[in-house]
Structure formats: structure tokens, C-alpha cells
């Protein structure tokens, strides 16, 4: 994808989510499944990486659902997104919740170029399937991590089951999320994500499935990664 096409694609994604920002914190609105998934995402991160007093960056933070949860676990949280309305919603909600979170309107690539002090943990949830270059996002995430730091990614697998459940079912039949939220061709299989991550200097530690039940509006971690999944990577430590 050339730079002009990539920019256009990213702009379209930003506009798509900006238009939904006012619904972000409504657990019955357009982000209803995300609210159900969030406790399991937080549990996965907290079980695999100590959070208290550690510097954490949430990339593609949206309205701040994950960022706030991680801040409540004691992490010093910074969070970035390219959607202006989402950042404003996140800042307002954090203020109302009396949480200290540093929200910035930046991409991971922009933030990495500004050379901040490296983070202990970087989270990138439900984002990589929306960016024009997953490889570039992973490379930026590595630059933002200290050696030995943890990266957590959640996304949707590219399988027939994920197409039927996460796209046809969730977007068109049950209308849990807006139509057009996901493009099947842009989804990554775990092996593809692991290969890109390895090229960026990351080691795969774990892949776990994240199952959502739309009828009970509940989620659980599972060994089945055929639809939603979480992946834990670690930045390779520098040689002594």
C-alpha cells in the first residue's frame, strides 16, 4: 500500500470511530461488546505483567476504557489515539473518574519518534486490524518498550468462523457493532502476527482465545483462538 492510500485508509478509520465517540462509555451502545470483553483483557494483562507503579502506554486507546482499568491497577498510564473526539471523551471521563491519565492525540509512530522514556508495558487492543501497516505499528511499539518489556495485542483471527461470527453475525445479523467496522482481508492470523512481531524484535510468549457470548453479553478466556484472541509478546533484552 502506497503512502497516499495508507493515509486515506487511516483517515477513514479515524472518522469512523470519531463519529461513535459519544457512545463510547454507554455499555448498551455501539461499544457494548467491548465493555464485556474489557475485564478479560485487563485480567490477561495483569496476570502476565506486574502493573503497580509501572509505566504503561495504551496505543489506540479510544475513549479510555482499557486505560482507566489499567490505571486502577496502579499503573502510570499514558494513552494515545488519532481520533480527536475519542481523546476528548477519554480526558473528560478520566477527569470525572479522578484518574491521572496522560492522553495525547498521536499515532504510535509519531510518539515513538519523539523518543519518550521507554515504557514497561504497551497495550494495543482492537487496533492492529484497523491500521494500514501492522508491521509499522509493531516496530513503533518496540521502540516504545524498554528491553524486556511486555506488549499485549488483541485482535480478530482470519478464519471462516471469525467471518461468520465477528462480521456477518455481529455486524449484519445481531447488529452489535456498526456495519463495516471490520474488513475480513485485513485480519491477521496468530501465526502472521507472530511473524511480523518476530521481525520487529519481539518474542511470542502466549496466544489465548477471547470468547464473546452475545446472548449473555459475557466473555471468557479460552484455548480457542479462532475468532478473537489475545497475544503477549516481550521485547528482546539487549545483549550484555
Predicted segments, located by residue:
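N-terminal, positively charged/glycine-rich alpha-helical extensions of SAM-dependent methyltransferases
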Residues: 1-25
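Conserved alpha-helix/loop element of class I SAM-dependent methyltransferases that forms part
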Residues: 35-52
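Acceptor-substrate binding/catalytic loop of class I
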Residues: 175-192
Amino acid at each position: 500500500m502506497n503512502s497516499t492510500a495508507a493515509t486515506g485508509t487511516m483517515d477513514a478509520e479515524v472518522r469512523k470511530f470519531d463519529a461513535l465517540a459519544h457512545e463510547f462509555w454507554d455499555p448498551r451502545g455501539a461499544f457494548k461488546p467491548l465493555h464485556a470483553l474489557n475485564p478479560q483483557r485487563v485480567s490477561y494483562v495483569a496476570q502476565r505483567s506486574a502493573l503497580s507503579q509501572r509505566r504503561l502506554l495504551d496505543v489506540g486507546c479510544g475513549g479510555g476504557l482499557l486505560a482507566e482499568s489499567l490505571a486502577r491497577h496502579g499503573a502510570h498510564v499514558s494513552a494515545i489515539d488519532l481520533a480527536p473526539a475519542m481523546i476528548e471523551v477519554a480526558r473528560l471521563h478520566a477527569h470525572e473518574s479522578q484518574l491521572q491519565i496522560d492522553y495525547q492525540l498521536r499515532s504510535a509512530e509519531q510518539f515513538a519518534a519523539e523518543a519518550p522514556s521507554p515504557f514497561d508495558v504497551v497495550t494495543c487492543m482492537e487496533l492492529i486490524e484497523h491500521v494500514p501497516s501492522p508491521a509499522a505499528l509493531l516496530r513503533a511499539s518496540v521502540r516504545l518498550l524498554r528491553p524486556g518489556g511486555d506488549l499485549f495485542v488483541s485482535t480478530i483471527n482470519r478464519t471462516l468462523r471469525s467471518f461468520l461470527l465477528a462480521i456477518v453475525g455481529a455486524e449484519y445479523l445481531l447488529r452489535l457493532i456498526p456495519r463495516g467496522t471490520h474488513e475480513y482481508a485485513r485480519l491477521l492470523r496468530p501465526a502472521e502476527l507472530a511473524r511480523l512481531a518476530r521481525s520487529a524484535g519481539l518474542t511470542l510468549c502466549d496466544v489465548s482465545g477471547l470468547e464473546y457470548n452475545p446472548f449473555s453479553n459475557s466473555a471468557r478466556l479460552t484455548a480457542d483462538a479462532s475468532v478473537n484472541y489475545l497475544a503477549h509478546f516481550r521485547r528482546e533484552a539487549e545483549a550484555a
